[in-house]
Amino acid sequence: MSTNDAQAHHQTLLDRYQQVQAKKLNLDLTRGKPATAQLALSDALDGILQGNYACADGSDARNYGGALGIPEARAFAADYLGAKPSQVLVGGNSSLQLMYQVVTNAYFHGVNASATPWRDEAGNGGSIKFLCPAPGYDRHFSICETLGIEMIPVTMDNNGPDMDQVESLLRADPLIKGIWCVPKYANPNGVVYSDEVVDRFAQLGKIAGANFRIIWDNAYAEHHLVENPPELANLLALSEQYGTLDNAVVIGSTSKITFAGAGISFMASSEANIAGFVDLLGIATIGPDKVNQLRHMRFLKDMPTLRKLMQAHRDILQPKFELVLKHLDEGLAGKTHNGQPLGTWTRPAGGYFVLFDTQPGLADKVVKLCAGAGVKLTPAGSTWPYKKDPANTNIRLAPSFPGLKEIDEAMQVFVLCVELATLEQ
C-alpha cells in the first residue's frame, strides 16, 4: 500500500470510528458470565425439594453439621472430578473461596498440622513464590498478590505450560510453593493440557520443595463447544500412582452449570489433605449450605443428566462464539501491516473465552479505542501476573453474557479498533 493509499485508508477508518462514537454504544465483553437464558435452564432448582430435606444418609439438610458435604453430593463430585468420595469435600457457592482457603491455610498454618507455614519457610530476605502459567486467570493472581506471594510467569503453548521451564524452576527454588492451573479450556486461551503435560504435573511433587501444591482449577470440565470434545487426563489417578497425591488439589463447581451465584463447589485431594482442611474450616463454620447441595443433587442427579444440561448450554453459547470468530475471520484474517498479521486468535473447543493477540505493544491501545467507542473489554494485561503483559498483546473476549445483536455490534467495533490501532502505531 502506497503512502497516499495508507493515509486515505487511515482516514476512512477514523471516519468510521467517529460514526460509531456517535451511536453512544454501551456494550460489554469483559467477564465470562452465563447469560440469563443459561441460568433459566436450571430454574427447576427453585422448589425442587418440596419439603423433603432428607439426605441419602437420613440426616436433615436443614440442620448443623456435615462439613464435608452431604453424601450424595460427595459421590457426584467424585464422578465429576475423577476422585473417590472419601477424597472429596463439597462446599458453598464459590470454588474461588475454596482455593483462597487452601492457599491462606497453607500460608498461615501449613499444609498440614505438622508442616511449617509457608510464610515462615522463607526466612530473612526470602519470599514464597507461585508459578503462574500465563496468560491465566486474574483472580488466581489476586490471591497471591493479596498475600504477598511472588508470582513467576510460565510460558504456555498448545499443550499447556512449558513443563521443562516448570521443572527447572522447581528444582532451582524450594520456596516455590504452588502452581495455578486451569487445565481444560484454560482461561483465557482455551488450551487443554496434553496427556504428557498432566503426567509430568503428577510427578512435580518429587521435584518440588516441601509442602508444594498444584491448584488444579478444573472450572470448565464439561463446558464444551464442539461435538467431540478433547479429554483431560486424570491428575488425581496419576498422582496416586506416583505417590504424590498430597501435592494435588483439584477444584470444580456448578457455577457455570446451574446458578452462577448459587451453585455448589467441589474439592478433591488426599484424604489427609481433606481432613486437615476440614479441621481449619470448622473454626469458621459448622457446615455448608446443605439444603442447596441437596436441591442440586435432586436436579442434577448424575453425570449423564449433567451432560444433557451442558448440551443445552452449548446450544446457547456456540452461536455466540461462532459470531465472534466470523467477525475476526472476515474482518482481519489475511490482513497484514509491516509484514505481520493484524492479529491472531484462538478457536476454543470449550470454555468461555476467545484470546486475541494484537501486534506487539498494541493491546492496551485497542482496549482504549474500544472503550472510547462504547465497548468495554477486560483491561489489557489482566490475564498476567501483576497485570503486566510483557508483550502487551493479549486481549480476552468474553461473549457468553451479551446477546447476538450486542456481540455483532461489539465485534464490528473491535475489528475496526484493531485495524485503527495497528495503522497508528
Mark where each language-model region is.
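Conserved glycine-rich beta-strand-loop-beta hairpin in the small C-terminal domain of fold type I
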Residues: 311-325, 338-357
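Short amphipathic alpha-helices in soluble, non-transmembrane regions
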Residues: 366-372, 410-415
